[in-house]
Amino acid sequence: MRHYEIVFMVHPDQSEQVPGMIERYSGVITAANGTIHRLEDWGRRQLAYPIQDLHKAHYVLMNVEATAESIEELETAFRFNDAVLRNMVMRTKVAVTEASPMAKARDERDSRRSPSDDRIEEESAEENAE
């Protein structure tokens, strides 16, 4: 089996269906005795250029170890799913398991947020509720 990095972009109106899509596509990989090394849901992000008059899309990244047949099946599923705007499948030499730069930036941003910020937000939410 070979290692692949898969990124697909979903129509922003279909964002609530992304967990189901991830489960379905993960099932294709695992049904063929493949392994998912990394799975990251990046959420809605700004597009570099409009696609079908859209300016945002929901991004998902997967690093998998799979057979060529299961990757072909996955690409076919992407092609026939109208909610998938774009997809890219790249073969890699080794399994990538560490967090992507996108995930690292999000974790770093979350860690920089101090507990006092949370307390201030809770207090303002309580004031707004009254």
Swiss-Prot record:
Q: Which InterPro entries match?
A: Ribosomal_bS6 (IPR000529), Ribosomal_bS6_sf (IPR035980), Ribosomal_S6_plastid/chlpt (IPR020814), Transl_elong_EF1B/ribsomal_bS6 (IPR014717)
One cellular component term (GO) for this entry is: cytosolic small ribosomal subunit
- Pfam families per the record? Ribosomal_S6
Basic and acidic residues composition bias: residue spans: 104-118
Please provide, alphabetically and separated by semicolons, the GO molecular function terms listed in this UniProt record: small ribosomal subunit rRNA binding; structural constituent of ribosome
Residues covered by region (Disordered): 96-130
Q: Which UniProt keywords apply?
A: Ribonucleoprotein, Ribosomal protein, RNA-binding, rRNA-binding
The GO annotation for biological process reads: translation
- Record family assignment: Belongs to the bacterial ribosomal protein bS6 family.
Function comment: Binds together with bS18 to 16S ribosomal RNA.
What this protein is called in its record is Small ribosomal subunit protein bS6
**From which source organism is this entry?**
Shewanella denitrificans (strain OS217 / ATCC BAA-1090 / DSM 15013)
